């Protein structure tokens, strides 16, 4: 067996993988939780995906080194705010290490739980945490959506592509 065929050795390095994944457009989200002391935590995430329809499940990837990791991994519930094109500023702030991520005043507290969310987002999912799975240098947090709030469906989404924010441009007329 050659070194390249060794299953214990990664086939590509982290930078090559990062460069390749920069070609994959992903929706921009802000994920928020409350910690055990009631403090708000939030971070911008591009690694949020639908995992299952029955039962409904979403997955949020969070780096083990993230300042929000401990709170996110321990939270009983979390909110995923799917951002629109007009929410670049909050996306940038929530992605900035050391920033006061809640300084802009855009966040509200979910009734009955207090978990912060962005009421002007395209969609907000309030999720109950069902599992946390270690995957390399990240934890994958699985959650069941228990409530969904939708905003303006005509608002274009905010996407992350090639290490920058983008908004899709329709190539065909919208269907009525």
UniProtKB/Swiss-Prot annotation:
InterPro entries: Flavin_Rdtase-like_dom, NADH-dep_flavin_reductase, Split_barrel_FMN-bd. The keyword Oxidoreductase applies. It comes from the Bacteria. Keywords: Oxidoreductase. One of its GO terms (biological process) is pyrimidine nucleobase catabolic process. GO terms for molecular function: FMN binding; riboflavin reductase (NADPH) activity. Provides the reduced form of flavin mononucleotide for the PIIA synthase reaction. PANTHER family: FLAVIN REDUCTASE, FMN REDUCTASE (NADH) RUTF. This is NADH:riboflavin 5'-phosphate oxidoreductase. The gene is snaC.
């Amino acid at each position: 067996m050659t070194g390249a065929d060794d299953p214990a050795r990664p086939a590509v390095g982290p930078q090559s993988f990062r460069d390749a994944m920069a070609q994959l457009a992903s929706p921009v989200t802000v994920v928020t939780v409350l910690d055990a002391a009631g403090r708000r935590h939030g971070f911008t995430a591009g690694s949020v995906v639908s995992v299952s329809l029955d039962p409904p499940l979403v997955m949020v990837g969070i780096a083990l080194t993230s300042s929000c990791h401990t709170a996110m991994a321990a939270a009983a519930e979390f909110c995923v705010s799917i951002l629109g094109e007009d929410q670049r500023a909050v996306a940038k702030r929530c992605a900035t290490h050391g920033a006061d991520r809640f300084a802009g005043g855009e966040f509200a507290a979910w009734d009955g739980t207090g978990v912060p969310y962005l009421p002007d987002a395209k969609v907000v999912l309030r999720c109950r945490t069902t599992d946390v799975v270690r995957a390399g240098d990240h934890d994958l947090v699985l959650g069941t959506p228990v409530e969904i709030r939708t905003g303006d469906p005509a608002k274009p989404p905010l996407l992350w592509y090639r290490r920058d924010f983008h908004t899709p441009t329709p190539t065909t007329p919208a269907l009525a």
